[in-house]
A protein has these predicted regions:
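Histidine/acidic residue-rich metal-binding segments in metalloenzymes
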Residues: 590-642
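Feature recognizes metal-dependent phosphohydrolase scaffolds
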Residues: 1-591
Length: 642
């Protein structure tokens, strides 16, 4: 009966033998083409500038395509200029107009070169697929240009006439921008984000806008994504958590400009309650300056401490509601000796580094004050009614999952929880035990329930609490550690108290036999399949390798986030899977800032601003100057020591 239902659905699209045969022929022909290129990124952590550049440049592949297409026909400077135009067409076109380079000749040459690159990057796709990626306004024209026969003199005249008409009708800029965007889209056929779009970096919202413009993207949820998803549902612990991390890393632009979260009540509360407290253990880590919402570090520290204390209270309330989480050891506020100024953690007493907790009642440490209750209620309303946040989170839901099987690759962010003996670890939800694939399937359904169930559904709160557990719980597949020592990091000096033990998965998965076990669990063949994983930064500088399990496992968190780069020694990885091979691109940390101070690239004034800023960041200065025209680059090099 079920087969008959499927056949009836197919009959709507293919009502007769001819229609079905035509589609079979089409699909068989497509199978003969090379597969599209897939790109895998992990742990973006709000680093929008780095990610957007990697995405638009296809991690350097577009520059390679330019070199392959033109060889020695154009200079290195022209290659760089063309590449930058493709990556950032709006910026490049503005510069061309500002510098009076936007002539008919420049437009004609640029369009010709872009069409050549389009032909190169579209060669592995069907004409139909390429047309679907074209901007509708220019689809017919672009289709004609990239399929013209240059050996036919009549067609060559036709080709030249099309370009001349584009320029004469003053549509050159729009057409060039359309070609640049098409090249970007054709170079990356499928984009996979292996979790953690949010937290630490300055503007996860800009990353989300970029992802939402992309034609084919999927997301495997990470623990930081889950925390923001939980915050969007109104889970108080998740709201406190994302606020705490954002304030800790000075991400006020994300909160206020990106998502319109009203932080004024929090700042007023913190300034009043912690007026005489320097909050030195809560000073923000300033990796990026705020552009729109600069906040004094002293006030930020008070806000940081205020929201952290509220977080510990509401987390404790969740733990009390759910003894099945087995997280009673995290009830640190209840284990403080306020007279002695100590806290007992796992049976050992430690002195508190910060004893100023004016809102914590020793008789009922987990109870919120009336002011705290009002504050967290207002913050909750701000999160639930943020149009941009809710729009982004709905996209994370609609394009995301706990894992994905695609082209013999198994994608997930954190881990598949395991025991020391190599068996899949178990977790009980509502009286039913889950492990392995079944655990991830159940959690995926539960995550959706937390967001999409109506507010008056009595079970919704249970699912919302589970979102917090997934952020930091000992058997959470997106977290992968036995505990999260946030409290210890703020209040205990002894680093041993803050130790977080990794799930046995991370040791076992370095062996091929356990990778094979996981692949079989998810229904993938052992031969030719791979696991693609993120979450744990690969410390390349300490000799760690991103490739494990005899080539079966790729860990691609290489430190795109600035906060991790001192640990990894690099600036991240991109995994690229094309029709020929699976390749891992390693992104080096910059040592120099190299500027082309030339006509049509950067002026001396622009070059000076760029290089001065680079030197403040500790980068060396290099300059290409006066190779085309003597515009003052050599003098600038002498002035700044480039």
């Amino acid at each position: 009966m079920r087969d008959l239902a499927y056949l009836r659905l197919l009959a709507r699209e293919y009502p007769n033998v001819q229609a079905a045969s035509s589609e079979i022929i089409n699909l068989m022909a497509i199978r003969g083409l090379p597969k599209g290129t897939e790109y895998f990124f992990s742990d973006l952590h709000g680093e929008y500038e780095a990610f957007v550049h990697l995405l638009r440049s296809a991690s350097g592949i577009i520059r390679e395509k330019i070199s392959e297409t033109f060889g020695y026909v154009i200079s290195d400077e022209d290659e760089i200029a063309l590449a930058n135009l493709i990556y950032y067409p709006e910026r490049g076109l503005r510069a061309a107009k500002r510098e009076n380079r936007f002539t008919e000749d420049w437009q004609r040459i640029t369009i010709y070169r872009l069409v050549c690159i389009c032909k190169e990057v579209s060669s592995k796709y069907t004409r139909s697929k390429v047309r679907k990626k074209m901007p509708p306004a220019f689809a017919y024209i672009i289709d004609e240009l990239i399929h013209v026969d240059y050996s036919d003199e009549n067609k060559k005249v036709y080709y030249d006439e099309i370009i001349r008409s584009i320029i004469d009708s003053e549509m050159g800029a729009e057409f060039i921008e359309a070609l640049c965007n098409l090249i970007q889209n054709l170079t990356i056929d499928n984009l996979h984000i292996i979790g953690d779009i949010f937290d630490r970096g300055p503007r996860a919202d800009i990353i989300m806008e970029e992802l939402m413009k992309f034609h084919d993207v999927d997301i495997q949820w990470g623990n930081h994504d889950i925390s923001w998803m939980g915050a969007a549902t109104g889970n108080l612990a998740c709201i406190c958590n994302v606020l705490r991390i954002a304030i800790r890393y000075n991400c006020f632009d994300l909160l206020e400009d990106g998502y319109g979260i009203n932080l004024r009540p929090l700042s007023m509360f913190a300034a009043r309650v912690y007026r005489d407290d320097a909050c030195e253990h809560f000073m923000p880590k300033i990796l990026d300056e705020n552009i729109y919402d600069a906040v004094d570090p002293g006030l930020a520290a008070k806000m940081h401490k205020a929201i952290a204390v509220i977080q510990f209270k509401v987390e404790g309330q969740i733990i009390k509601r759910h003894p099945e989480y087995n997280m009673e050891d995290r009830l640190h506020l209840t284990r403080i000796n306020f007279e002695k100024g100590t806290v007992t953690i796992k049976g050992k007493e430690y002195p508190l580094t910060d004893k100023k907790l004016p809102t914590v009642d020793p008789k009922d440490p987990l109870k919120l004050t009336k002011e705290e209750e009002e504050l967290i209620h207002n913050l909750c309303m701000s999160f639930k009614h943020s149009v941009n946040l809710q729009r982004h989170i709905r996209f994370v839901y609609s394009h995301g999952a706990m894992y994905k099987c695609c082209n013999s690759n198994l994608l997930y962010h954190g881990c598949i929880p395991m025991k020391e003996n190599g068996d899949f670890d178990e977790i009980k939800f509502n009286g039913i035990i889950y492990s392995g694939k079944r655990m991830l399937d159940y959690i995926e359904d539960a995550v959706k329930m937390a967001y999409f169930l109506p507010d008056d559904d009595t079970s919704k709160e249970w699912y919302k609490d589970l979102m917090w557990y997934l952020w930091c719980g000992p058997k959470s597949p997106v977290y992968g550690k036995d505990n999260m020592a946030t409290f210890e990091g703020y209040f205990v000096a002894d680093k041993a108290a803050a130790k977080e033990n990794m799930n046995p998965y991370y040791k076992l998965s370095t062996k091929e036999e356990f990778c094979d076990k996981i692949l079989r669990e998810f229904g993938l063949p052992v031969e030719g399949s791979h696991i693609i994983n993120g979450h744990v930064p690969v410390k390349l500088k300490d000799g760690e390798s991103p490739i494990k399990g005899n080539g079966k496992l790729f860990v691609i968190d290489g430190g795109l986030a600035k906060s991790y780069q001192p640990k990894t020694g690099i600036a991240g990885y991109t995994l690229i899977f094309n029709s020929r091979h699976l390749a891992l691109a390693e992104h080096k940390l910059a040592e120099y800032c190299d500027v082309f101070c030339e006509t049509g690239v950067f002026t001396p004034a622009e070059s000076q601003r760029i290089l001065t800023a680079a030197q403040k960041l500790g980068l060396g200065a290099k300059i290409h100057a006066d190779e085309i025209d003597p515009i003052g680059g050599s003098q600038l090099a002498g002035q700044i020591g480039a």
